[in-house]
Amino acid sequence: MEKKAAKREMFEKRLALRKRSHHAGCMFNRQPAVSGLNFRFDDSGKLRGEFECGKERQGYDGMVHGGVVAAIIDASMAQCLMGHDIVAYTADLSVRYRRPVTIDTPIVIITSVLQSRSEYLYMLESEICQNAELAVKATGKFVRPKLIAV
């Protein structure tokens, strides 16, 4: 159990360091970008967040704007990589909306690194669930430019 806690702590420390050094101006690093959004790692390196969006993030009546959902997914993927000590940029983001994400209802996002195709290309996956049902599934490709010092 101590090893798992140490692993989670390692991911959290890496994320905090990378956010300060490479991501300080990101709107998702300021509080509150989305009210209550707080990412945490599990011992396997998956990033998990729980939050709610109110009317200020609404698109169609009663639904969270799809662009807000995509931005949250993008931020979670970037921060998941930072927790793995990787600074990379979004090259491709594919978002599949399976059902509406409703306002004023708890939302859970889980993001994981699927694979690394090289030291410069990373594949990630995110799932957003609401009421224990999958609402949004996304995949992303992130590229680490050769010019970034990590």
Predicted regions and their residues:
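Beta-strand secondary-structure signal
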Residues: 48-50, 94, 108-110, 123-125, ...
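Non-catalytic linker/capping segments at the edges of enzyme domains
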Residues: 1-55
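Hydrophobic residues in beta-strands and at strand termini
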Residues: 51-53, 97, 144
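A conserved, well-ordered hydrophobic junction motif at loop->secondary-structure transitions
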Residues: 48-72
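Hydrophobic beta-strand-centered segment that forms part of the acyl-chain substrate-binding groove
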Residues: 75-113, 142
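HotDog/MaoC-like acyl-thioester-processing domains
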Residues: 1-16, 101-103, 114-150
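Short beta-strand micro-motifs enriched in acidic
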Residues: 40-42, 112-116
